[in-house]
């Protein structure tokens, strides 16, 4: 209900009172940050590899850094909304997840978020799907046809990639800072105020949108 509390800092513990929302958000979140095996992982790593194997290293490293950022803001919502103390004192009831108009789309969209990458991998890679893009897709196709071969090998190969390391860094930082309230992560923010200011200002996106889009 949009007219109720929207500040995630005032939420917590909602995984028990909104279990379906919790499960579908978890699936969608894992896909968004590109956890190996999820649909978002296939699309993310394919895009990253396009730049890597075409020697566009500046964009490649920018994308790797963006994985950490994406992981941080996604898991921040996850920990603050669904874990910790139930600050809203919300009890499990049919009133919270009673509307099929909302629940059915959540469930329907969560399913392909988990599995569609496996189904489309061969089509995207081995049928030269990227050959007409702005980069040389044939280089990528050659690499996958000769070294990766199939989606299972691509999945296993991902655990040795730099993007997976970036994912782990983002997960660990988020877990200790947002969930465990670790003193080390808090000290890092205190000693490096620039990082704290960037996070508090939400990367400047709100200021940018407010300056470009009229309030009325």
Please place each PLM-identified region on the residue numbering.
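Membrane-interface interhelical loops and short amphipathic "cap" helices
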Residues: 41-57, 127-137
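Phosphate/oxyanion-binding loops and surfaces in catalytic or ligand/nucleic-acid-binding neighborhoods
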Residues: 30-33, 71, 81, 85, ...
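Membrane-interface and transmembrane segments of multi-pass membrane proteins
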Residues: 102-216
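Short amphipathic alpha-helical coupling elements at transmembrane boundaries
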Residues: 3, 9-16, 46, 83-84, ...
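Interfacial and helix-entry/exit segments of alpha-helical transmembrane bundles
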Residues: 2-38, 48, 54-67, 91-115
């Amino acid at each position: 209900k949009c007219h109720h509390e929207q500040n995630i800092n005032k939420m917590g513990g909602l995984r028990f009172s909104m279990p379906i929302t919790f499960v579908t958000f978890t699936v969608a979140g894992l896909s968004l940050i590109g956890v190996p095996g999820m649909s978002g992982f296939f699309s993310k790593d394919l895009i990253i590899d396009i730049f890597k194997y075409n020697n566009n290293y500046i964009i490649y490293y920018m994308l790797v850094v963006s994985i950490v950022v994406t992981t941080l803001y996604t898991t921040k919502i996850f920990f603050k909304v669904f874990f910790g103390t139930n600050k809203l004192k919300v009890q499990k009831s049919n009133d919270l997840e009673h509307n099929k108009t909302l629940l059915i789309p959540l469930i329907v969209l969560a399913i392909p978020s988990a599995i569609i990458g496996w189904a489309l991998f061969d089509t995207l890679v081995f049928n030269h799907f990227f050959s007409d893009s702005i980069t040389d897709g044939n280089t990528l196709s050659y690499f996958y046809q000769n070294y990766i071969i199939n989606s299972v090998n691509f999945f296993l190969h991902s655990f040795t990639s730099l993007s997976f390391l970036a994912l782990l860094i983002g997960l660990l930082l988020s877990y200790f800072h947002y969930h465990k309230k670790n003193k080390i992560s808090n000290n890092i923010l205190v000693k490096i105020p620039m990082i704290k200011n960037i996070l508090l200002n939400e990367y400047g996106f709100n200021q940018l949108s407010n300056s470009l889009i009229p309030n009325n």
